[in-house]
From Swiss-Prot:
The lineage of its organism: Bacteria, Bacillati, Mycoplasmatota, Mycoplasmoidales, Metamycoplasmataceae. It catalyses: UMP + ATP = UDP + ADP. The keyword Nucleus does not apply. InterPro entries: AceGlu_kinase-like_sf, Asp/Glu/Uridylate_kinase, Uridylate_kinase, Uridylate_kinase_bac. Its EC number is 2.7.4.22. Inhibited by UTP. GO terms for molecular function: ATP binding; UMP kinase activity. This is Uridylate kinase. Homohexamer. GO terms for biological process: 'de novo' CTP biosynthetic process; UDP biosynthetic process. It holds the Pfam family AA_kinase. Pathway: Pyrimidine metabolism; CTP biosynthesis via de novo pathway; UDP from UMP (UMPK route): step 1/1. ATP binds at K13, L14, S15, G16, G57, R61, N166, Y172, D175. Coiled coil: none annotated.
Length: 245
């Protein structure tokens, strides 16, 4: 298959909000988790090595909290703990379909909950067919989980970063949810994406994460996680997406 020839080790970036279901008032919808698990089960059988970075926005938004009297640094640390909760939920979902999964945290945390992030150990797990879920963001405030994703992808020497979005199937010149006439890009250079991020105010990725991806030559596929089997399809080139390289 084309996707197998192109990529071996992938980094999947999941937002915390993408795990929630507002209609059902669920912070974590286990049907969504199970759907992701089933897709990864198929991907795993094809020989992919899968690393995951997950956000925590379904539980906590550090930026908004800082406006309500909580110092930004503390708010960000609370957000890092939120990513750990999501990582543990994903781990359980993956194990329920027979996948081996580890959680590594960039924050020092009790070993009964998660392992501390050690680069070589994480690479060893990936090489042995285990899924590694990275929690805690970068472990430092003022950095987004998008930046954590490009950082981990760089350290893990991933071939591609799959940037999962909620209800948006790629990069547009404007917010397609607001502007129906927004134009979608099939492909972009890193510099073009950086220009869009800085000038259009679109929350595709933050500028730090784009710059890091460029410096480490990490390809990015931006796609809609809500589309059925979208993780499988985007790797096969059969899902709407934007490729950045």
């Amino acid at each position: 298959m084309e996707c197998v020839m192109k990529y071996k080790r992938i980094l999947l970036k999941l937002s915390g909000e993408g795990l929630s279901n507002k209609k059902k008032s669920l912070l974590i919808d286990y049907e969504i988790v199970k759907n992701i698990a089933i897709q990864l089960q198929k991907i795993h059988k094809q020989g992919y090595e899968v690393a995951i970075v997950v956000g925590g926005g379904n539980f906590w938004r550090g930026e908004s909290a800082s406006k309500n009297g909580i110092p930004r640094t503390r708010a960000d640390y609370i957000g890092m703990l939120a990513t750990t909760m999501n990582a543990l939920a994903l781990q359980s979902g993956f194990e329920s379909v027979g996948l081996k999964a580890r959680v590594q945290s960039s924050l020092s945390i009790d070993g009964k909950v998660a392992e501390n992030y050690i680069t070589e150990k994480a690479k060893h797990y990936l090489s042995n067919g285990e899924i590694v879920i990275f929690a805690g963001g970068t472990g430092r405030p003022f950095f987004t989980t998008d930046t954590a994703a490009t950082l981990v992808a760089s350290e893990m020497q991933c071939d591609v970063l799959l940037m999962a979005k909620n209800g948006v199937n790629g990069v547009y010149d404007a917010d397609p949810k607001v502007s129906p006439s927004a134009i979608k890009f099939d492909s972009l250079s890193y510099d073009e994406l950086l220009h869009i991020v800085l000038t259009n105010g679109l929350k595709i990725m933050d500028s730090t994460s784009v710059t890091m991806a460029k410096e480490n030559n990490i390809k990015i596929l931006v796609f809609d996680i809500q589309e059925k089997d979208s993780i499988l399809k985007v790797l096969e080139g059969n899902a709407e997406h934007t490729k950045v390289e």
